[in-house]
Amino acid sequence: MSWQQYVDEQLTGAGLSQGAILGANDGGVWAKSSGINITKPEGDGIAALFKNPAEVFAKGALIGGVKYMGIKGDPQSIYGKKGATGCVLVRTGQAIIVGIYDDKVQPGSAALIVEKLGDYLRDNGY
């Protein structure tokens, strides 16, 4: 399965409004859904958050021009919120999965979608 298929089928196909997969080391965009534009500085910032996840509480997470307030930050998962929408970021060995949800999706459901893909990629060496 290609990285784009993971985004299309496992993230947006599962109900998230937007999704992307980035390189864990450099934050480069490997695949993304339409409607999300993660700039190089944003990708760098996302990758850097996983080096010091507690910073998400002070700095938030900037994704596609939207700043999300940090509500969870650990070396494996970062969650953010902005009003009724939010983001779930999950780091595997080689990738960072980005899931964006809108007000039609419960935060717990969004987290389950992204964490499940993260577990699958980790189990398969990514």
From Swiss-Prot:
InterPro entries reported for this sequence: PFN (IPR048278), PFN_euk (IPR005455), PFN_sf (IPR036140), Profilin_CS (IPR027310)
Cysteines engaged in disulfide bonds, as pairs: none
GO CC term, one of those recorded: extracellular matrix
SUPFAM superfamilies membership: Profilin (actin-binding protein) (SSF55770)
Any Pfam family: Profilin
Function per UniProt: Binds to actin and affects the structure of the cytoskeleton. At high concentrations, profilin prevents the polymerization of actin, whereas it enhances it at low concentrations. By binding to PIP2, it inhibits the formation of IP3 and DG.
Family named by the database record: Belongs to the profilin family.
Name of the protein: Profilin-1
Species this protein is from: Dictyostelium discoideum
Gene behind this protein: proA
